[in-house]
Design a protein with these regions (language model features):
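A small/polar active-site loop signature that marks catalytic segments
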Residues: 1-103
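C-terminal soluble interaction/assembly domains
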Residues: 68-203
Length: 203
């Protein structure tokens, strides 16, 4: 017989997702993923079971994603067991690119930050989300080349052996280990930027 006293409506999911991607908020990613799982299967309560439900939906809705390599232990990716291949992520981008979102029927790039190229004269526009850990760097989204050609892309740079060594190193928070890891990240970012600028100029 209880009656509600007050209710608070959240912002539209599209707006929440924009902030999530802008600030890389892992808690928001977990909560959105769990809410999605509960919508698909009421009663889901844990992050692991929620990730399994969403992965099952992906397998049915976008079979290429799971077929090409999508193993998620949770919804944020902050787990050593999580593995996603470039091909699987590209399949997800293609699915997103074929749809429109929100009341304004916007393309999926409305979710992503527009990034400028570091060098002058590269041309083009970049809408992408990056992910960074020591010995792992990725970026995915859409590149609009200087010629006006839209390209979906996924770039991943990973050193699995160095990452495993870093995780198993008791001194990983000490300066020498951190310095080496940061050097690797700088090289990965430079390579990533060079590839994207080359595509922007030549394709």
């Amino acid at each position: 017989g209880a009656e509600p006293v007050a209710a608070h409506e959240s912002r539209a999911m599209l707006e929440i997702a924009v902030d999530l991607l802008e600030y890389s908020n892992n808690l928001s990613a977990e909560l959105i993923g769990l809410a999605t799982a509960q919508k698909l299967k009421p009663g889901v309560s844990s992050l692991a079971s929620g990730a399994a439900v969403v992965r099952g939906w992906l397998g049915k809705t976008i079979p290429d994603v799971t077929r090409l390599g999508w193993q998620s232990a949770n919804q944020s990716g902050l787990a050593g067991q999580t593995r996603v291949t470039p091909a699987a992520l590209l399949a997800l981008l293609r699915f997103a690119d074929a749809r429109r979102y929100g009341a304004g029927q916007a393309p999926f790039t409305v979710l992503l930050r527009e990034t400028e190229f570091a060098s002058q004269g590269a041309g083009g526009r970049l809408y992408a989300k990056s992910g960074t850990m020591f010995y792992a760097r990725g970026q995915a989204g859409q590149l609009l080349t200087a010629s006006g050609r839209p390209l979906l892309f996924v770039l991943m740079h990973t050193d699995f052996a160095s990452r495993a060594g870093y995780e198993g190193n008791a001194a990983r928070y000490k300066a020498p280990v951190q310095i080496r890891a940061n050097r690797w990240l700088r090289r990965a970012r430079v390579a990533e930027q060079a590839i994207l600028e080359y595509w922007a100029k030549t394709l």
